[in-house]
Curated annotation (Swiss-Prot):
Keywords: Autophagy, Endosome, Lipid-binding, Membrane, Protein transport, Transport. The keyword Transmembrane helix does not apply. It comes from Debaryomyces hansenii (strain ATCC 36239 / CBS 767 / BCRC 21394 / JCM 1990 / NBRC 0083 / IGC 2968). Residues 79-202 form the PX domain. GO terms for cellular component: cytosol; endosome membrane; phagophore assembly site membrane. Required for cytoplasm to vacuole transport (Cvt), pexophagy and mitophagy. Also involved in endoplasmic reticulum-specific autophagic process and is essential for the survival of cells subjected to severe ER stress. Functions in protein retrieval from the endocytic pathway. The lineage of its organism: Eukaryota, Fungi, Dikarya, Ascomycota, Saccharomycotina. Belongs to the sorting nexin family. GO terms for biological process: autophagy; protein transport; retrograde transport, endosome to Golgi. The keyword Kinase does not apply. The PX domain binds phosphatidylinositol 3-phosphate which is necessary for peripheral membrane localization to the perivacuolar punctate structures. This is Autophagy-related protein 20. A 1,2-diacyl-sn-glycero-3-phospho-(1D-myo-inositol-3-phosphate) binds at R118, S120, K144, R167. InterPro entries: PX_dom (IPR001683), PX_dom_sf (IPR036871), PX_Snx41/Atg20 (IPR044106), Sorting_Nexin_Autophagy (IPR051079). Residues 1-59 are annotated as: Disordered.
Length: 625
């Protein structure tokens, strides 16, 4: 095989494209009504062997080549430091209330590209980026309209136009942040390139149903927290914690500080468990193969507190901004009314005294100065306060809310980490109960085989039967009660299918990810008080029965040990990634905040400078009269 064949499809990313497989004219004529059947034509060189099929094949090859070239062009433009990204226009789709936004990508070397996207496609891109990169703070987009907002917009069209203009600015900032002011992994993501690809303009759903998105399980808790596309089959065996929703801002879990205390208790339980296990198995203490994750770093705990405090402060600042915008609008309306009245008054004075126009000119100049100030205030409000101050502050709030979503994901992974240990504790206790029951059953069988009417033997038999009953009741009463604390409504027992061959059990690299393996019902793992009677009736050998159950649980414990090693490694890696990314995020936010403040001060200074110049001109005019 040619070694170059390994990269045969490496550059092809335009699959599932209508334009990739054929001419886009079929979109205008999808049912082929304008087609006319005609016999194969002979080419101009007179060779009848070259038909239209050959020409179509050559044409399709050209389309493939063009798509690959376009994909490469997008990749180059994204990495171009001189790239300009703007949302230049918006338009309503035909017979629909949906608005499409035109995104223009341009650079100094005359490269220019336009692609149209709807709000739902922007949201889809961001949601999928959050799933692909669960440790990165993804730039925010405007929130979706509520039903009440839609009703208001249907009454007042000007409000809807303002919202569309706001979205245009926010979408442009969203794309600029991804390309220029975020982790390099975001702008290198294939999904971002497809979003900017005109070939995917009409088939965005295909893009989100292709790799890498299609490789991620439905529940992000069943994936590698740092690399969700990892196809390690062990992740499909992890316990699910109900209530997890990455995109929601609702977080009902305790703070990281409280979870840290729970982790300390868990580590104490693990230590006691290992000691008892060593005593029961009569072996020397051994070093764990994987270092245990023992504590949440204080830096992450401080990050959570910091984010909450900043959200509180910025939310209050948003309220002040809203009041300031209303006050500016009130000032503008007052200046408009005052300027108009002064101009009318100057005309009335001029009509009353046509011989001298000094007073009329003075009043007119004063009104003109008021009008100039009104225009300055209006420009400051529409061009500076709203787009350069109010909207960026709201964007910072959304940034911090997104960072809290990452912390929420981290909390759920901590809980999942604890649940894996709880599963091991319960499963080991189940093994101990079955082993004890097996030993008791063997003793009971031996005692009954003695066939001696002895009070001491009868007392021993009763004692063994009582112990068996107590073991069963304890097993039933304590059965997986921890799972109910997290909203579980199904059996959480970690069971491997007894009829599943060992070769098919998910392990590293198997890629069994999409569906969880059906679990054996807990009833299959329960045992009667007097199992010998049932076993004799069904002619099942009691020894093989118990040995089979014990062997099954030992296999499950082996898998649980693998899961513990996996989760230990994942939690440690996730902690390091979040620490690193949050530090980088705060540096970026600090830069954004400085830029916002400096721009606000500069624009405000320019407003007052222009107002002062207007009044100085008015003063000079008055002195010259």
């Amino acid at each position: 095989m040619n070694p170059n064949d390994n990269n045969l499809f490496g550059d092809i990313e335009q699959d599932n494209n209508p334009s990739f497989y054929g001419n886009q004219s079929f979109l205008r004529d999808p049912y082929g009504k304008s087609k006319q059947t005609c016999p194969p034509s002979v080419t101009s060189n007179g060779d009848p062997s070259i038909t239209n099929d050959d020409n179509n094949s050559a044409h399709n090859n050209d389309l493939v080549s063009n798509s690959i070239v376009l994909s490469k062009k997008i990749e180059q433009m994204v990495n171009d430091p001189n790239l300009q990204i703007n949302v230049i226009s918006s338009e309503r789709m035909i017979n629909s209330s949906v608005v499409a936004y035109s995104i223009e990508l341009s650079s100094f070397d005359d490269n220019r590209m336009i692609v149209k996207r709807r709000y739902s496609e922007f949201k889809s891109l961001r949601d999928n980026l959050q799933i692909l990169f669960p440790t990165l703070v993804i730039p925010p987009i405007p929130e979706k309209h509520t039903l009440f907002t839609y009703l208001i917009n249907s009454i007042d069209n000007s409000k809807e136009l303002n919202i569309i203009e706001t979205r245009k600015r926010c979408f442009a900032n969203f794309l600029k942040d991804i390309i220029f002011d975020s982790n390099v992994a975001l702008k290198s993501c294939v999904l971002v390139h497809k979003f900017l690809d005109p070939n995917y303009e009409l088939c965005w759903n295909n893009a989100v149903n292709e790799p890498p998105v299609s490789l991620i399980p439905n529940n992000l808790l069943l994936a590698n927290p740092v690399n969700p596309t990892d196809q390690n089959g062990l992740y499909s065996l992890l316990p699910i914690v109900n209530g997890f929703e990455l995109n929601s801002n609702i977080d009902n879990i305790s703070s990281l500080h409280k979870l840290n205390e729970d982790l300390h208790k868990l580590n104490e339980q693990v230590h006691v468990f290992e000691l008892r296990k060593e005593q029961n198995e009569r072996r020397h203490p051994s070093e764990p193969t994987t270092s245990l994750f023992t504590e949440i770093p204080i830096s992450l705990i401080d990050f959570e507190k910091n984010f909450h405090q900043n959200i509180k402060v910025l939310t209050e600042l948003n309220k002040l901004n809203s009041r300031s915008v209303k006050n500016f609008k009130s000032i503008i309306n007052t200046l408009i009314e005052l300027g108009g009245n002064l101009n009318n008054f100057s005309l009335q004075i001029h009509e009353l005294n046509t011989d001298s126009n000094a007073l009329s000119s003075l009043i007119e100049k004063f009104g003109s100065t008021i009008d100039s100030n009104f225009l300055g205030y209006e420009a400051f409000l529409m061009n500076d306060i709203i787009p350069e101050w109010q909207e960026p502050i709201s964007q910072l709030v959304q940034y911090y809310l997104t960072s809290l979503q990452l912390i929420k994901f981290y909390k759920f992974k901590i809980i999942q980490y604890k649940l894996v240990y709880k599963l091991k504790f319960n499963k080991y206790q189940e093994l101990a109960n079955i082993s004890t029951n097996f030993e008791s059953q063997s003793k009971l069988k031996d005692l009954r085989n003695l066939d001696i009417d002895s009070p001491s033997i009868n007392e021993a038999i009763k004692k063994i039967e009582l112990n068996q009953k107590r073991l069963k009741n304890r097993k039933i009463s304590s059965k997986k009660s921890w799972y109910g604390l997290f909203g579980g409504n199904s059996k959480p027992t970690f069971n491997l299918r007894e009829d599943l061959p060992a070769s098919t059990i998910p392990s590293e690299g198997t890629g069994i990810r999409r569906e969880r393996t059906p679990l054996v019902s807990d009833e299959n793992m329960s045992y009667p008080v007097n199992p010998s009677a049932n076993l004799e009736n069904t002619n099942i050998d009691i020894n093989s029965h118990y040995k089979h159950k014990i062997n099954q649980i030992e296999k499950e414990l082996t898998k649980l040990d693998q899961l513990i090693d996996l989760t230990n490694t994942d939690i440690s890696t996730l902690t390091q990634e979040l620490n690193l990314n949050f530090n980088d995020f705060l540096v970026r936010v600090e830069k954004k905040w400085l830029v916002i403040m400096l721009e606000f001060i500069k624009n405000g200074k320019q407003l007052f400078k222009d107002n002062l110049q207007n009044w100085n001109e008015c003063k000079v005019f008055i002195n010259d009269l």
